[in-house]
Each structure stands twice: as C-alpha cells, then as structure tokens.
C-alpha cells in the first residue's frame, strides 16, 4: 500500500465520475476500503452525536459525555494492560455499567441497533463498489472501529455492500490503520499483491 497513491485516490473520489474513478483503481490486485465516512455515512456532524439518541432512549441526561469518557477510559486501561488502545464495544459498556448502573448487554444492543438504523450508503462509493464487483475485483474492508463484527456486517448488508473478501476490524486484532499495524497485517495476508486503500490512514 503506497501512502501517496492512496491519498491521491481518496482525493479523486467524488471529483471524478464513477467510471473514471473505477478506471484509476481497477488494475490493482486488491482494493481496500475504509467503512465510515467512505462507504458509509452517518446523519451527524460528529460520530458521537449518536450518543444523544441513545441517552434519550435510556432517559439519561448526560449520557453523551459519559459514553465518550467511558470509551476514553477503556482505551487507557487497554493501553496499560495490552500496549494498545483498540477496544471493543463490550469494553466500553462494561465501563459504563460500572459507572452508571446501565445494563451493558442492553446498551450494546441499543447502540448497535441505533447505528444500523441510521447509517446509510455513500451513493458515489456504492456505485464504485458495484462496478468493481461486476469486474470481479477482490475487495476488502479495513476499519478502526469498536463496533462488533456482527453489527458492521449488518450495516454493510443493509446498505448494499456485499461480497467483501475480508473484513479487518481493529478491535479484533489490537491493531489499527492509524498506526499502520493493521495495514501490515493486510500486506502479509495478501503477500505480493498490489493493494490500494480508499479512505483515511494512509
């Protein structure tokens, strides 16, 4: 994965026509996509705004701030224990249950259901995905995310992104895109392949 190429292709997305963008990336052996803000959009200016809705359902006034803090605290605990900050939704909600008394299982279910309900496809990228699919291209998904695989797979299914060869989620590996470790795993798994990434990091 060449950073300069990936950054250039990300800038091209949405500027070029779908056909021109596909033409620029179709000769790579493997095409990697980020999920959120690339394949998938949320109807908020900030991803944490979804916590307002979850707080309303729990009738918990200061839920957003508590949810943000619980994630930060879970990451700090994970860093101390494991040397990285990639946490799962369960890690976060166990913190919340301890601090607020809210039921972790119910909270995780509600957060996933809310994300699944609100997320929608980036129409440009969905066309790109479908076009590459028709060409028989190998496509993978790489995401720095705390949501569980089951939730992410349902979001992708609902929004029309089917047929990914592999889905890499940071909280399953304790590695992330931002630090490069998750991309190194991808490169090892697809040894010798020419790979391009569409999204952030790199």
Give each language-model segment a name.
Residues 1-33, 194:
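Non-catalytic pre-domain segments flanking phosphatase-related domains
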Residues 14, 82-141:
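Short, acidic loop-to-helix structural element flanking the phosphoryl-transfer center
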Residues 21-68:
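Active-site neighborhood of HAD-like aspartate-dependent phosphohydrolases
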Residues 36-40, 45-46, 145-149, 173-175, ...:
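Short, solvent-exposed loop/turn segments at secondary-structure junctions
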Residues 65-93:
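N-terminal accessory alpha/beta regions
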Residues 100, 133-140, 145-171:
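Substrate-recognition/cap helix-loop segment adjacent to the acidic, metal-dependent catalytic center
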Residues 118, 123, 129, 155-172, ...:
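Hydrophobic, small-residue-rich alpha-helical packing segments that form membrane-like cores
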Residues 179-202:
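Conserved Lys-Pro-Asp/Glu-containing loop-to-beta segment of HAD-superfamily phosphomonoesterases
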């Amino acid at each position: 994965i060449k950073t300069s190429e990936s950054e250039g292709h990300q800038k091209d997305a949405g500027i070029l026509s779908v056909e021109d963008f596909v033409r620029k990336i179709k000769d790579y052996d493997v095409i990697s996509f980020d999920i959120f803000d690339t394949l998938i959009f949320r109807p908020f200016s900030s991803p944490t705004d979804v916590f307002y809705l979850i707080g309303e359902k729990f009738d918990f006034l200061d839920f957003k701030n508590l949810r943000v803090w619980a994630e930060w605290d879970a990451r700090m605990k994970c860093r101390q224990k494991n040397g990285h900050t990639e946490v799962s939704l369960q890690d976060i909600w166990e913190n919340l249950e301890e601090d607020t008394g809210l039921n972790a299982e119910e909270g995780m279910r509600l957060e996933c259901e809310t994300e699944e309900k609100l997320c929608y496809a980036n129409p440009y990228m969905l066309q790109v995905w479908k076009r590459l699919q028709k060409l028989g291209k190998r496509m993978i998904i790489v995401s720095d995310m705390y949501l569980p695989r089951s939730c992410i797979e349902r979001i992708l299914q609902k929004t029309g992104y089917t047929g990914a060869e592999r889905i890499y989620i940071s909280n399953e590996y304790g590695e992330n895109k931002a630090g490069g470790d998750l991309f190194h795993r991808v490169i090892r798994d697809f040894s010798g392949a020419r790979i391009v990434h569409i999204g952030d990091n790199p």
